[in-house]
Amino acid sequence: MRRALAWLLPLLVAGCSSLDEGQAGVVGIEVQVPGPDTLEVGESIQLGARPLDKNGDSASAAVTWVSVDPTASIDPSTGVLTGLSVGTARIQATVGSLGSSLISFAIVPRADTLQIAGDSIFTASVTASPLPNFTTVVFSFSPLGPVPTHGVVYAITSPDPLVSPAPVVLSTNGQVTDTVPTGTDGTAVTSLALTPGAVPPESVVVTISSTRIRGVVVPGSGQHFILHFTP
């Protein structure tokens, strides 16, 4: 939870002996923002604000919310913020003439689907180098197009990933699981690498998954790549 304080200008210059009070004795606004400060198009989050009196206690006053940019809308009374279009959205909480500092959010494309790009089943020799690429793409329907800089999880699920040392790993990090970010075209790519000295498995299954910013599973998660090895 991110918090920001907004104080009336007279408070900054009046010294400790006196405070100029605004509406209903409010001299400051404490704003609560659930992290992260990134919002997908169509996603809504609840913001909170607490008017403060000169003693730092809660003051009884209505807070009005304002969206400065057209990239997001916010309910003036409830503080529910909704992403509308890609870009930066600046939000402010107000009580009378007192306004909080502008709070910025990055509005990004919504991750609507995770797809396998091209083949999902491959056959390769154990001596082949490099091994085939496993390519996925994260796509958005709002706005229509690829989703860049979004994490795709590749996880070796067969052979048993708990066996150590693993006979095969992902080439991007040398582990059995890796989160690979998508590029500007929405694609994420990895491949396999055999562990030197280990007995190659007959086949390898790699499961893909992805989540949205606040944990919702992206449709298409759970698909598999399969690589069969030949001598």
Give residue ranges: language-model regions.
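Extracytoplasmic soluble-region selector
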Residues: 17-231
